[in-house]
Curated annotation (Swiss-Prot):
Residues 124-223 bind DNA. Phosphorylated by CckA. GO terms for cellular component: cytosol; protein-DNA complex. It comes from Caulobacter vibrioides (strain ATCC 19089 / CIP 103742 / CB 15). Pfam families: Response_reg (PF00072), Trans_reg_C (PF00486). Residues 2-116 form the Response regulatory domain. Forms part of a two-component regulatory system CtrA/CckA that controls multiple events in the cell cycle, including cell division, stalk synthesis and cell cycle-specific transcription. Binds to a group of cell cycle-regulated promoters critical for DNA replication, DNA methylation, and class II flagellar biogenesis. PROSITE patterns: OMPR_PHOB, RESPONSE_REGULATORY. InterPro entries: CheY-like_superfamily, OmpR/PhoB-type_DNA-bd, Sig_transdc_resp-reg_receiver, WalR-like, WH-like_DNA-bd_sf. SMART domains: REC, Trans_reg_C. GO terms for molecular function: DNA-binding transcription activator activity; DNA-binding transcription repressor activity; phosphorelay response regulator activity; sequence-specific DNA binding; transcription cis-regulatory region binding. Keywords: DNA-binding, Phosphoprotein, Transcription, Transcription regulation, Two-component regulatory system. This is Cell cycle transcriptional regulator CtrA.
Length: 231
């Protein structure tokens, strides 16, 4: 999961970054609202964490600017203010959630997962695709009731495929999701990850493959039950 953190207090930013990275998130930080707006427009994040008190512009202005620009990335506000008026303004401006500092790590992680799930159209923390069950909170995968042990990169790919089930994802999208533009390997590494992921899933799925290759475009995760119904 890719998170943009817009926070001007370096100590707070470092603490949040460590919290999220310990959960396997890819975190990108900036202490300026204007830069946060630019990054939010250019890159595809799963979530934006936004502080309200920034040195160059208010967090509410950052929020409104992103929404006016039709950026639909979920935005969670981080603020030391518990004032109702402030909360009302942020929700009216397009915020998806609001957390008051200081906050507990477990609550923050749970809220992040909930907001991202809703943004992808999933109200529950478990996504089922045929025999495959992905638990987004526990970061576990089961096939036919059997636990499948995946590497971090393999899990991130399956999570992305599950969240965007039925949508063809390009190799560039996978690469951006896994590495976020930092020390990215060649595109062919995605084929290697997909091959390994397919083998692990098929071993518990009686040889069935749920990840399809869309030649010249990328890969897609399809629910076999939906295909049967469509037929």
């Amino acid at each position: 999961m890719r998170v943009l953190l817009i926070e001007d207090d370096s100590a707070t930013a470092q603490t949040i970054e460590l919290m999220l990275k310990s959960e396997g998130f890819n975190v990108y930080t900036t202490d300026l609202g204007e830069e946060g707006v630019d990054l939010g427009k250019i890159y595809d994040y799963d979530l934006i964490l936004l502080d309200l008190n920034l040195p160059d512009m208010s967090g509410i202005d950052v929020l409104r600017t992103l929404r006016v620009a039709k950026i639909n990335t979920p935005i969670m506000i981080l603020s030391g203010s518990s004032e109702i008026d402030t909360k009302v303004k942020t929700f009216a401006g397009g915020a998806d959630d609001y957390m008051t500092k200081p906050f507990h790590k477990d609550e923050m992680i749970a809220r992040i997962h909930a907001v991202v799930r809703r943004s992808k159209g999933h109200a529950q923390s478990v996504i089922k695709t045929g025999d495959i069950v992905v638990n987004l909170d526990a970061k576990t995968v089961e096939v036919n009731g059997n636990r499948v042990h995946l590497t971090g990169k393999e899990y991130q790919m399956l999570e992305l495929l599950s969240l965007r089930k039925g949508t063809t994802l390009t190799k560039e999208m996978f690469l951006n999701h896994l590495y976020g533009g930092m020390d990215e390997p060649e595109l062919k590494i995605i084929d290697v990850f997909i091959c390994k992921l397919r083998k692990k899933l098929a071993a518990s799925a009686h040889g069935k493959h749920h990840i399809e290759t869309v030649w010249g475009r990328g890969y897609v995760l399809r629910d076999p039950n939906e295909q049967v119904n469509a037929a």
